[in-house]
C-alpha cells in the first residue's frame, strides 16, 4: 500500500488514485506470543509498551498521514504530497520494521539456523559467529536510534548486513530484502538494560526466531 501510494511515477498516478480511494486502514498486528514470553531476555513491560504504545502510534500516524496524502493526490497538490513524504517514510517504516521484528523473535528461539540459511551465512560471512559479531557491531554502532539488519541482495544472491537510521525501511532505502531486524531504539531495551546497548544485543540472540528468518530467506530466493 505504502510503496504504491508514495513511489508511483506520474504514469501511475491515476491507478494510485483509484487504489487509495478504496484503501483499507493499517492495523496493529497481534503478537504471536504473550508480552512476558521473551523473559528474562526482554521483559514484559518493555514488550507491552513497545507493541501497544510505540508500534500502535506508528500505525495510527500512518493512517492519518495516508488520509492527508489521499486528499493531496485528489487535489493535485504536489507541494502537500512532498511535505508528507517524511511522515510517510517514518511512520510507514515504523510499521513495516516492527511487523517484521515481532515475527523475528520467539520464546523458543536462539541457537543457530539450519539448512540453506546457515550455509549461506557461512558462505557470505565465514562462520555463524563472525556473522553474529558483524551484525552485533553494526547494531551497537548505530548513532542515536535505528535498526541493524540482515538483508538479502537479490541481484547478487548474497546476504548483507546493513544499519538504518530512525525508522528508515531496509528495502525502501537500500534495496535489500529484510530477513532479520534488530531494533536499537532506546524504547526497545532501556527499561531493562538502561544505556548498555551491547547487553541488549547479547540477550536478543537468545530469542531470535531462526525458523522465521529462514522462511523469509527461502521466499526471497524464489
Swiss-Prot record:
Catalysed reaction(s)? Answer: 2 superoxide + 2 H(+) = H2O2 + O2
Question: Would you tell me the Gene Ontology cellular component terms?
Answer: mitochondrial matrix
Matches recorded under InterPro entries: Fe/Mn_Superoxide_Dismutase, Mn/Fe_SOD, Mn/Fe_SOD_BS, Mn/Fe_SOD_C, Mn/Fe_SOD_N, Mn/Fe_SOD_N_sf, SOD_C_sf
State its location(s): Mitochondrion matrix
Tell whether Glycoprotein is among the UniProt keywords. Answer: no
Where does the record place the modification N6-acetyllysine? Answer: 68, 75, 114, 122, 130, 202
**Co-factor: note:** Binds 1 Mn(2+) ion per subunit.
Q: What is its main location?
A: mitochondrion
Could you list this entry's UniProt keywords, alphabetically sorted.
Acetylation, Manganese, Metal-binding, Mitochondrion, Nitration, Oxidoreductase, Transit peptide, Ubl conjugation
Q: Consult the record and explain the modifications the protein receives after translation.
A: Nitrated under oxidative stress. Nitration coupled with oxidation inhibits the catalytic activity. Acetylation at Lys-122 decreases enzymatic activity. Deacetylated by SIRT3 upon exposure to ionizing radiations or after long fasting.
Q: Which residues are reported to carry the modification 3'-nitrotyrosine?
A: 58
Instruction: Name the needed cofactors.
Output: Mn(2+)
Enzyme Commission numbers on file: 1.15.1.1
Sequence positions that bind Mn(2+): 50, 98, 183, 187
Per UniProt, the enzyme's principal EC class comes to oxidoreductase
Tell whether Metal-binding is among the UniProt keywords: yes
The portions of this protein that span the membrane are: none
Q: Where on the chain is N6-succinyllysine found, per UniProt? A: 68, 75, 122, 130
Which residues form the organelle targeting sequence per the record?
1-24
Entry GO MF terms:
manganese ion binding; superoxide dismutase activity
> What family is it from?
Belongs to the iron/manganese superoxide dismutase family.
The record's subunit annotation is: Homotetramer.
Function of this protein?
Answer: Destroys superoxide anion radicals which are normally produced within the cells and which are toxic to biological systems.
The record's listing under PANTHER family reads: SUPEROXIDE DISMUTASE 2, SUPEROXIDE DISMUTASE [MN], MITOCHONDRIAL
Protein name per Swiss-Prot or TrEMBL = Superoxide dismutase [Mn], mitochondrial
Source organism of this protein record: Macaca nemestrina
Which gene holds the coding sequence for this protein?
SOD2
